[in-house]
């Protein structure tokens, strides 16, 4: 009864808003709406900028090349750095500076961190398989650095991360400047179509820094990582590389191949990234890379 009386009193005491009050309310609403509309594109622009690498380089050092014929059915880019001449050849500069998940190409640096922390060593990198049934037969076995890199064994590198811990991993990310350095999605998944992202240009820069040991890591550790990604070696020529494939909803949408070629007195560093709704695999990125390098007379197949 008291509640009913209170409601009646409130209704009887209600006064219709004046025209001026309505105008003030509408004006305030309009200002807020305009502010929100103004902020939204700013936030979108900021997010977009975060996805791109801000590359500070003289345009004279870059040769923009048309390699679209090699990328039939794919979006993506090819980046080549000539160490001797300090020059770049790039197909699709927009995609070359676009950051995306590194997937298994990141294992190059994860191995390096594990070596630096003595989780593994150049002489003893053996890890025992824990018996978990993995989707690839090659993963269901014991591994060392070389076999794990060759078969791209996820659990091997996840174990390195587990022993490293988040704090140490973040410090290493910052030390080498790995892409956006974001591992917030967790130690098991951050490099697999998740929060960690890097551009093709940055991939080449990091490979160059690794090759020259600009990180000032133990030389034997750097050499161990180089050896683990050596694919072919012959007199006066060596070919190094690592693939990566990103899968979303059962489809391969993000393919990588990164590496370098040593020839006589020069070294060429490369990255190929392909993206599509399907079939964008590291293997297909590798085939594209081989065709380009062959046509450039850098490596014959």
Predicted stretch roles:
Residues 1-48:
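Hydrophobic topogenic segments
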Residues 45-72, 82, 99, 162-165, ...:
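Structured C-terminal helix/loop/strand segments within mature extracytoplasmic catalytic/sensor domains
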Residues 78-84:
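Short hydrophobic alpha-helical segments used for membrane anchoring or interfacial signaling
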Residues 84-97:
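Short, conserved catalytic-motif segment at the N-terminal edge
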Residues 99-124, 148, 270:
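Active-site SXXK
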Residues 115-132, 218-222:
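Short, well-structured active-site flanking segments
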Residues 126-147, 173-181:
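Active-site helix/loop module of the DD-peptidase/beta-lactamase fold
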Residues 144-145, 157-208:
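Mid-domain, small-residue-enriched loop/turn segments at the edges of structured enzyme/sensor domains
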